[in-house]
């Protein structure tokens, strides 16, 4: 990941979620928060499916880090990530398929 003219390596398994803010992304990991100038779509090219799931137009989550679902939000550590209405069913199906949640 490129950040302030530096290249930084981030372990994919440590990423909790990626949040888009216009042309910037925030990559929240277990140990740090990095900000990079890149559209979310470009970052998603490097994140393997089905581990990483887009759950909202502004959020991609690491499905292995989901602890709970509370209404229309996913709980990952102390963070609550919104689930878009139009992506709700696909999100649940993906989590079920990977045996990360049960009905």
Spans of model-derived segments:
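Conserved binding/recognition cores within well-folded domains
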Residues: 1-76
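Eukaryotic intrinsically disordered, low-complexity regulatory linkers and tails enriched in Ser/Thr/Pro
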Residues: 1-6, 79, 85-103
């Amino acid at each position: 990941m490129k950040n302030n003219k530096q290249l930084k390596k981030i372990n994919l398994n440590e990423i909790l979620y990626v949040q888009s803010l216009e042309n910037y992304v925030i990559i929240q990991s277990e140990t740090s928060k990095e900000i990079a100038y890149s559209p979310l779509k470009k970052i998603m090219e490097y994140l393997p499916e089905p581990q990483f799931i887009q759950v909202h137009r502004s959020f991609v989550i690491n499905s292995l880090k989901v602890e709970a679902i509370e209404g229309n939000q996913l709980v990952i550590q102390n963070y609550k990530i919104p689930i878009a209405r139009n992506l709700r069913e696909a999100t649940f199906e993906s989590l079920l398929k990977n045996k990360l949640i049960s009905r």
